[in-house]
Amino acid sequence: METKTFYNEVLTDHNMHPYHKHDIDNADLELEGVNPSCGDDIILKLKFDDAKKTIVDGAFTGDGCAISQASADIMLELIIGKPIDEAVHLSELFLKMIKDEATEEEIDELDEAGALRDISHMPARVKCAVLGWQIGRASCRERV
């Protein structure tokens, strides 16, 4: 019950008040992802510090269901300020969690994103939850 309440609070907060849903100028990388089964469309923009190999800023625009929008916002909150290789690692952990294959320790690494763990039991919503993370992982892999 406590996990479900936390899930609802995290999802609602990031959907209703997404901190990272806006446009940014002069992004180093821009990728779009679409989930045709739900109508989700996310355009992710990231800025990198190539010398430090870190993500210094990021934002997303687009439309979609509450899960896709909240999940993208949670991802950006988690990866901004992190080294690029760590962002890839976190994205891979999230995708592992959604497949119900992550350990408790790995889920703990995901901080608030761990609240979405039960999406693995909702097959129709999996594509919604992973869209932003797949785009983020692809963006970071282009910079490594």
Give the location of each predicted region.
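Conserved active-site and cofactor/substrate-binding residues in soluble primary-metabolism enzymes
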Residues: E2, F6, V10, D41, ...
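Short, conserved "active-site rim" segments that organize catalytic pockets and cofactor/ligand binding
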Residues: T3-D25
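Structured beta-strand/loop patches that form or line metal/cofactor-binding pockets in enzymes
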Residues: H17-D57, G62
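Short, glycine- and charge-enriched coil/turn segments that flank and shape catalytic ligand pockets
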Residues: D25, D49-T54, D100-D108, R141
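Active-site- and interface-proximal helix/loop "cap" or "latch" segments in soluble metabolic
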Residues: V56, F60-D118
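Glycine-rich and small/hydrophobic secondary-structure elements
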Residues: D111-R137
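Conserved small/polar residues in nucleotide/adenosyl-binding loops
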Residues: A138-V144
